[in-house]
From Swiss-Prot:
One of its GO terms (molecular function) is peptide binding. Keywords: Chaperone, Isomerase, Periplasm, Repeat, Rotamase, Signal. It holds the Pfam family Rotamase_3. GO terms for biological process: Gram-negative-bacterium-type cell outer membrane assembly; protein folding; protein stabilization. The PPIase activity resides only in the second parvulin domain. The N-terminal region and the C-terminal tail are necessary and sufficient for the chaperone activity of SurA. The PPIase activity is dispensable for SurA to function as a chaperone. The N-terminal region and the C-terminal tail are also required for porin recognition. This is Chaperone SurA. Its EC number is 5.2.1.8. Chaperone involved in the correct folding and assembly of outer membrane proteins. Recognizes specific patterns of aromatic residues and the orientation of their side chains, which are found more frequently in integral outer membrane proteins. May act in both early periplasmic and late outer membrane-associated steps of protein maturation. It comes from the Bacteria. It catalyses: [protein]-peptidylproline (omega=180) = [protein]-peptidylproline (omega=0).
Amino acid sequence: MTAITRITLTGALLAAALLLAALQPARAETLDRIVAVVDDQVVLASELERELATIANQLRSRGQRLPPRDVFQRQVLERLITQRVQLSRAQRVGITVDDATLDAAMQRMARQNNMTLGQFRQAVEQEGFEYNYFREGIREEIAISRLRQAQVEEQVTVTPQEVEEVLETLDDENQEYRLGHILVATPEAASTAQLEEARERIEQLREQIIAGETDFEGAATAFSDAASAMEGGDLGWRLHSQLPSLFAEAIDEGLQAGEVSGVLQNSSGFHLVKLMDQRTQGGERVTETRARHILIRTDGDVITDEDARLRLRSLLERIEAGESFAELAEAYSEDPGSAARGGDLGWTQPGQLVPEFQGAMDALEEGQISAPFASPFGWHIVQVTDRRERDVSRERLRDQLAQQIHQRKVEEAFEQWIRRLRDEAYVDVRVEL
């Protein structure tokens, strides 16, 4: 068993240079006696001394004072016992790390430190460690990482509601809203008949907008009594605090981008507002593209590159002659994911597609179809069907919050899990602390 510095194998493997700087050889004169038994595993005195020296060096390098010897030794021994408890559980549930996986991990550690594997091995040995001993320590850490992932991380879920609750607690003053506005004004001392007539007018306008008989901007220009009528009702971008309270309430009640509010009333008359867009102040806007494609795969033998290109050229000519792109994609495209949707790839953001496809698509205007081109998947023709600018700041904030909530819940679950493992394990400490 090994007692090398703990290594976390989530994301990239740790920078081995830092690890090697902390590692120091065990004292040669340490007697190898058992200091603790954990299930069917043992912790040796030499391992405890090695871990004490390693952690002491780390603390000193950070300018921290060491705790009293008895406290320090108790903390480090408990750390080793916790490691053994996890290794014992990993063995019981059948978690193993084969040599191929271990070899790949060692190669990654070497690459991350700009070394060949031979140079990395030499660096480990120069620090006084036998390389195979170091290697087996990495094997143990991979096993522990897999155990934690299976029994803790994968059991933790984050619901959309949890994320939304956190979002609601955040200060929304950095949110900007672009509203469209229609006003049917009423006199200051309007009669009941005047109020009813105004309400009926705006309700009819709303019904026509919802039914698609007119668009909001056109209705605002033609019928709104507000100062923004000539701008199609566009109020421009405003912070939440800059919105009239009546409009802010509509936002707070859940009005979504593209939606038209119900009829709102105040002393000025009756209002409709449309949330045209929303963004985070100073946020990140991207151009999203909606496209559809037809893919012909090649195998180098039966279907060559030239065969695929000619087949796509023929399909392109049929589309230009008036046949439906969607129907031809459904019939001939060899991309099963999109063929059933007429080749539609949905909305994509820059960087989501392979560079060859992204470049061909970005060069097109809306409605334009590309010439046949190759990608790692085969040969394509692509048509851009729509483009839009969209603020993705809130989406990315939502993703970040989900990750943060997940990490917090994992940490809480891990503490409970490790305590349970410790309580369930047989532990016999054979040294006075």
